[in-house]
Amino acid sequence: MSYICVIGNENGIVAGSDSRETIAPNKFLDNRQKAFVDKKQNLIWACCGITKYNGIDYIDVVESILRDTNLSFIEKIDRLQIMIERVTKECYNYIGNGSAMDILIGYKLKRKILIRMNIQNGEVKRNTFFAPLAIEGGSGKMIMNKLPLKDYNHLSLKELEVYVKSRVQKTIDKDKEISINDPTHVNTIGGKVRTVAL
Protein backbone atom coordinates (compact mmCIF):
# COMPACT_ATOMS: atom_id res chain seq x y z
CA MET A 1 0.00 0.00 0.00
CA SER A 2 2.97 2.39 0.08
CA TYR A 3 4.39 4.77 2.63
CA ILE A 4 3.67 8.48 3.12
CA CYS A 5 4.64 10.95 5.82
CA VAL A 6 4.20 14.64 6.59
CA ILE A 7 6.32 16.58 9.07
CA GLY A 8 5.67 20.17 10.03
CA ASN A 9 7.38 22.72 12.24
CA GLU A 10 7.62 26.52 12.58
CA ASN A 11 9.71 26.64 9.38
CA GLY A 12 7.25 24.81 7.13
CA ILE A 13 5.80 21.44 6.19
CA VAL A 14 7.28 18.60 4.11
CA ALA A 15 5.38 15.65 2.60
CA GLY A 16 7.10 12.54 1.28
CA SER A 17 6.16 9.26 -0.36
CA ASP A 18 7.41 6.30 -2.29
CA SER A 19 6.32 6.11 -5.94
CA ARG A 20 5.16 2.50 -6.32
CA GLU A 21 1.70 1.75 -7.69
CA THR A 22 0.23 -1.74 -7.66
CA ILE A 23 -1.54 -2.24 -11.00
CA ALA A 24 -2.29 -5.97 -10.58
CA PRO A 25 -1.22 -8.66 -8.11
CA ASN A 26 2.61 -8.58 -8.08
CA LYS A 27 2.74 -6.03 -10.95
CA PHE A 28 3.96 -2.54 -10.19
CA LEU A 29 4.81 0.81 -11.71
CA ASP A 30 7.37 2.96 -9.92
CA ASN A 31 6.46 6.43 -11.14
CA ARG A 32 3.31 7.36 -9.18
CA GLN A 33 3.14 10.82 -7.63
CA LYS A 34 1.57 10.68 -4.17
CA ALA A 35 2.86 13.90 -2.56
CA PHE A 36 1.58 17.31 -3.68
CA VAL A 37 1.76 21.00 -2.79
CA ASP A 38 -0.39 24.02 -3.65
CA LYS A 39 1.55 27.04 -2.41
CA LYS A 40 -1.18 29.54 -3.36
CA GLN A 41 -3.61 27.79 -1.01
CA ASN A 42 -0.97 26.93 1.63
CA LEU A 43 -1.78 23.21 1.27
CA ILE A 44 0.44 20.17 1.15
CA TRP A 45 -0.67 16.53 1.12
CA ALA A 46 0.20 12.92 0.46
CA CYS A 47 -2.14 10.01 -0.16
CA CYS A 48 -1.95 6.28 -0.79
CA GLY A 49 -4.09 3.19 -0.76
CA ILE A 50 -6.88 2.53 -3.21
CA THR A 51 -5.52 4.22 -6.30
CA LYS A 52 -7.86 3.16 -9.08
CA TYR A 53 -11.29 1.59 -8.85
CA ASN A 54 -13.98 1.31 -11.54
CA GLY A 55 -11.85 3.35 -13.93
CA ILE A 56 -11.49 6.29 -11.53
CA ASP A 57 -8.07 7.44 -10.31
CA TYR A 58 -8.67 8.44 -6.69
CA ILE A 59 -5.29 10.08 -6.16
CA ASP A 60 -6.22 12.40 -9.04
CA VAL A 61 -9.66 13.01 -7.49
CA VAL A 62 -8.07 13.89 -4.11
CA GLU A 63 -5.77 16.33 -5.90
CA SER A 64 -8.69 17.88 -7.79
CA ILE A 65 -10.70 18.44 -4.60
CA LEU A 66 -7.78 19.91 -2.66
CA ARG A 67 -6.87 22.26 -5.52
CA ASP A 68 -10.49 23.49 -5.92
CA THR A 69 -10.40 27.19 -4.99
CA ASN A 70 -14.22 27.34 -4.79
CA LEU A 71 -14.30 25.15 -1.67
CA SER A 72 -13.35 26.16 1.86
CA PHE A 73 -10.75 24.06 3.66
CA ILE A 74 -13.45 22.37 5.77
CA GLU A 75 -15.58 21.65 2.68
CA LYS A 76 -12.57 20.00 1.03
CA ILE A 77 -11.91 17.75 4.03
CA ASP A 78 -15.59 16.79 4.35
CA ARG A 79 -15.91 16.06 0.62
CA LEU A 80 -12.78 13.87 0.69
CA GLN A 81 -14.03 11.94 3.68
CA ILE A 82 -17.48 11.25 2.19
CA MET A 83 -16.05 10.20 -1.18
CA ILE A 84 -13.37 7.86 0.19
CA GLU A 85 -15.76 6.38 2.78
CA ARG A 86 -18.12 5.43 -0.04
CA VAL A 87 -15.51 4.01 -2.42
CA THR A 88 -13.63 1.95 0.19
CA LYS A 89 -16.91 0.50 1.48
CA GLU A 90 -18.08 -0.30 -2.06
CA CYS A 91 -14.72 -1.86 -2.96
CA TYR A 92 -14.68 -3.89 0.27
CA ASN A 93 -18.24 -5.16 -0.31
CA TYR A 94 -17.43 -6.08 -3.92
CA ILE A 95 -13.94 -7.56 -3.57
CA GLY A 96 -14.25 -8.87 -0.03
CA ASN A 97 -10.80 -7.97 1.28
CA GLY A 98 -9.42 -4.83 2.90
CA SER A 99 -9.83 -1.55 1.06
CA ALA A 100 -8.12 1.52 2.49
CA MET A 101 -6.82 4.99 1.76
CA ASP A 102 -4.64 7.23 3.89
CA ILE A 103 -4.61 10.99 3.31
CA LEU A 104 -2.21 13.28 5.18
CA ILE A 105 -2.76 17.02 4.84
CA GLY A 106 -0.80 20.03 6.04
CA TYR A 107 -2.41 23.48 6.09
CA LYS A 108 -0.27 26.52 6.72
CA LEU A 109 -2.03 29.27 8.67
CA LYS A 110 -0.62 31.20 11.64
CA ARG A 111 -0.08 27.71 13.02
CA LYS A 112 0.53 24.68 10.86
CA ILE A 113 -2.31 22.17 11.01
CA LEU A 114 -1.77 18.49 10.17
CA ILE A 115 -4.71 16.20 9.44
CA ARG A 116 -4.56 12.43 9.18
CA MET A 117 -7.45 10.55 7.58
CA ASN A 118 -7.40 6.77 7.55
CA ILE A 119 -10.39 5.30 5.74
CA GLN A 120 -10.69 1.53 5.82
CA ASN A 121 -13.64 -0.43 4.42
CA GLY A 122 -15.85 2.66 4.76
CA GLU A 123 -14.80 3.43 8.35
CA VAL A 124 -13.02 6.74 8.98
CA LYS A 125 -10.48 7.75 11.60
CA ARG A 126 -9.70 11.46 11.33
CA ASN A 127 -7.30 13.34 13.61
CA THR A 128 -6.17 16.95 13.64
CA PHE A 129 -2.83 18.05 15.12
CA PHE A 130 -0.75 21.19 15.39
CA ALA A 131 2.89 21.26 14.31
CA PRO A 132 5.58 20.58 15.32
CA LEU A 133 4.63 16.99 14.63
CA ALA A 134 5.13 14.08 12.25
CA ILE A 135 2.32 11.90 10.87
CA GLU A 136 2.53 8.88 8.59
CA GLY A 137 0.33 6.51 6.64
CA GLY A 138 0.30 3.46 4.39
CA SER A 139 1.48 -0.06 5.09
CA GLY A 140 5.04 1.16 5.58
CA LYS A 141 4.18 2.51 9.00
CA MET A 142 3.63 -1.10 10.13
CA ILE A 143 7.13 -2.28 9.22
CA MET A 144 9.06 0.65 10.70
CA ASN A 145 9.42 2.00 14.18
CA LYS A 146 6.92 4.79 14.67
CA LEU A 147 8.14 8.27 13.77
CA PRO A 148 9.52 9.70 17.01
CA LEU A 149 7.43 12.18 18.95
CA LYS A 150 10.03 14.88 19.25
CA ASP A 151 10.38 18.59 18.75
CA TYR A 152 11.14 19.10 15.07
CA ASN A 153 11.40 22.89 15.46
CA HIS A 154 15.20 22.90 15.45
CA LEU A 155 15.21 21.70 11.82
CA SER A 156 15.25 24.11 8.90
CA LEU A 157 12.86 23.43 6.01
CA LYS A 158 15.76 21.92 4.02
CA GLU A 159 16.71 19.70 6.98
CA LEU A 160 13.08 18.59 7.31
CA GLU A 161 13.11 17.61 3.64
CA VAL A 162 16.31 15.58 4.11
CA TYR A 163 14.78 13.89 7.18
CA VAL A 164 11.59 12.98 5.27
CA LYS A 165 13.57 11.66 2.26
CA SER A 166 15.68 9.52 4.56
CA ARG A 167 12.62 8.14 6.37
CA VAL A 168 10.86 7.19 3.13
CA GLN A 169 14.03 5.59 1.70
CA LYS A 170 14.58 3.54 4.88
CA THR A 171 10.99 2.30 4.61
CA ILE A 172 11.46 1.32 0.95
CA ASP A 173 14.68 -0.53 1.86
CA LYS A 174 13.03 -2.30 4.82
CA ASP A 175 10.07 -3.48 2.71
CA LYS A 176 12.47 -4.82 0.06
CA GLU A 177 14.52 -6.62 2.74
CA ILE A 178 11.37 -8.23 4.16
CA SER A 179 10.30 -9.44 0.69
CA ILE A 180 13.74 -10.99 0.09
CA ASN A 181 13.59 -12.88 3.40
CA ASP A 182 9.88 -13.78 3.17
CA PRO A 183 8.65 -14.91 -0.26
CA THR A 184 5.01 -14.44 0.85
CA HIS A 185 5.56 -10.72 1.51
CA VAL A 186 4.54 -8.52 -1.43
CA ASN A 187 6.94 -5.60 -1.92
CA THR A 188 4.34 -2.81 -2.37
CA ILE A 189 6.64 0.02 -1.21
CA GLY A 190 9.21 1.08 -3.77
CA GLY A 191 10.31 3.31 -6.59
CA LYS A 192 11.88 6.70 -6.05
CA VAL A 193 11.37 8.92 -3.03
CA ARG A 194 9.27 12.00 -3.72
CA THR A 195 9.08 15.03 -1.46
CA VAL A 196 7.40 18.43 -1.62
CA ALA A 197 7.83 21.37 0.75
CA LEU A 198 5.68 24.29 1.83
What are these language model-derived features?
Residues 2-92, 125-197:
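Conserved short S/T/G-enriched processing/targeting/catalytic segments and their helical context
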Residues 104-110, 196-198:
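Short hydrophobic alpha-helical segments used for membrane anchoring or interfacial signaling
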